[in-house]
Amino acid sequence: MVRKIITYPNPRLFLNSEIVNKFDTELHTLLDDMYETMIASNGVGLAAIQVDIPLRVLLVNIFDENDEQKKEDLLEIINPEIIPLDEEMITCTEGCLSVPDFFEEVKRYNHILLKYQDRFGEFKELEAKGFLAVAIQHENDHLNGHLFIEKISFAKRQKFDKEFKKKKKNHKKEK
């Protein structure tokens, strides 16, 4: 089932998500719904808080070298812990399903170790580089109540705030 994605400035986006302790059918349904929601929204990642569920659950499904997004490449990440493996940073243009129509460059670690649990509670580790590492860090920020717009420069944040207010004003006029 496709769920509704909550968008900025909804205060629930700024909640810290809770650790998952039950790896049951309810969690599996959430993961399946999140995948359907992410694909229907043309996303490469989604955190549970974005569908208004404050649990430490996220999905990442980036496009492969053939520009295809395959379900077998889907990462279901529960209770993640991210460890930078070096100090090298990478700058990528990021967007967010909870901050629609805004894209900006953000610096993040280029090489990380991800420790997490899968849908069955099994502990896993994954070394990630480049865009995969960036996508994981972006989604993990959601679990800690942060959005990518908090990582942009002051000037770019002012630009975002101005565009957001203008869009909100135009939306009210349309109603």
Swiss-Prot record:
One GO BP annotation of this record: co-translational protein modification
Keywords associated with the record: Hydrolase, Iron, Metal-binding, Protein biosynthesis
Pfam family for this entry, one: Pep_deformylase
Family, similarity comment: Belongs to the polypeptide deformylase family.
Binding site for Fe cation: 96, 138, 142
Annotated protein name in UniProt: Peptide deformylase
Listed cofactors: Fe(2+)
EC number: 3.5.1.88
Molecular function (Gene Ontology), one example: peptide deformylase activity
Record Gene3D superfamilies: Peptide deformylase
Active site as annotated: 139
Catalysed reaction, written as an equation: N-terminal N-formyl-L-methionyl-[peptide] + H2O = N-terminal L-methionyl-[peptide] + formate
Keyword Methyltransferase: no
Cofactor, free-text remark: Binds 1 Fe(2+) ion.
Domain of life: Bacteria
Entry function: Removes the formyl group from the N-terminal Met of newly synthesized proteins. Requires at least a dipeptide for an efficient rate of reaction. N-terminal L-methionine is a prerequisite for activity but the enzyme has broad specificity at other positions.
